[in-house]
Amino acid sequence: MHTRTVFFISDGTGITAETFGNAVLAQFEMKPRHVRLPFTDTVDKAHQAVRQINHTAELEGVRPIVFTTLANMEVLEVIETGCKGMLLDMFGTFVRPLEIELAVKSNHRIGRFSDVSKSKEYDARIAAIDFSLAHDDGQSNRDLEGADVILVGVSRSGKTPTSLYLAMQHGLKAANYPLIPEDFERKQLPPALMPHRKKIFGLTIQPERLSQIRNERRPDSRYASLENCRNEVSEAEAMMRRAGIRWLSTTTKSIEEIATTILQELKPERLVY
């Protein structure tokens, strides 16, 4: 497939336009060249953007793809009528039809989605991130009653990135604990976690993949050996079965897929959108 230039145009930071655009582009096997045009908030800047888009179209002999999130209708009109790209306007596609359906005019405020520094949702996310960092890798057993999710699994099975994703994306207070040889000898989860079993979710991973990941960190060590990884994974999975907790393999799953499964299984009450 021919490499396309993709423009992301916004009268704000452009984060929403880029997130929306990348989610759509991910459905196609292509490596687009990204051009970001944030703060396109005047007619003059819109004309500059049009000239850049049209120059790219002439230079490459193919239409650029243009994703926009423009609240200013005058600016949008300049882009719509002047550019020679394929225009995909997020507000026109989603916001304006919703205005008709809801019979309510949207705020059309620039950067409304991202301007959360004074909101309750922002505060909830910051509190969740602080909690998750304080309870990363079993650093603390305190205040576990305040946790929304407690992840357990062998070292390097994906607990920390999943915890931080849950905190940043959903405002969930996520603790995580590594399962270690002492736990395997006792053949049960860490005692401090047992009162909170309903919040516990286990992560496992194929031993071969675990050994590969650990070798990147500590090459040729017993910790990273395939034999040790097989033993740890086997013990951890047996422990999870005995405890009756829900768990999944992270081997072929993205952080987003892991987090979504956890939300579906545990159904935490406190979610930030």
Curated annotation (Swiss-Prot):
The keyword Iron does not apply. Pfam families: Kinase-PPPase. Its EC number is 2.7.11.33, 2.7.4.28. It comes from the Bacteria. Keywords: Kinase, Nucleotide-binding, Serine/threonine-protein kinase, Transferase. InterPro entries: Kinase-pyrophosphorylase, PSRP. ADP binds at residues 153-160. It catalyses: [pyruvate, water dikinase] + ADP = [pyruvate, water dikinase]-phosphate + AMP + H(+); [pyruvate, water dikinase]-phosphate + phosphate + H(+) = [pyruvate, water dikinase] + diphosphate. Transmembrane segments: none annotated. One of its GO terms (molecular function) is ADP binding. PANTHER family: PYRUVATE, PHOSPHATE DIKINASE REGULATORY PROTEIN 1, CHLOROPLASTIC. Bifunctional serine/threonine kinase and phosphorylase involved in the regulation of the phosphoenolpyruvate synthase (PEPS) by catalyzing its phosphorylation/dephosphorylation. Belongs to the pyruvate, phosphate/water dikinase regulatory protein family. PSRP subfamily. HAMAP family: PSRP. This is Putative phosphoenolpyruvate synthase regulatory protein. It comes from Variovorax paradoxus (strain S110).
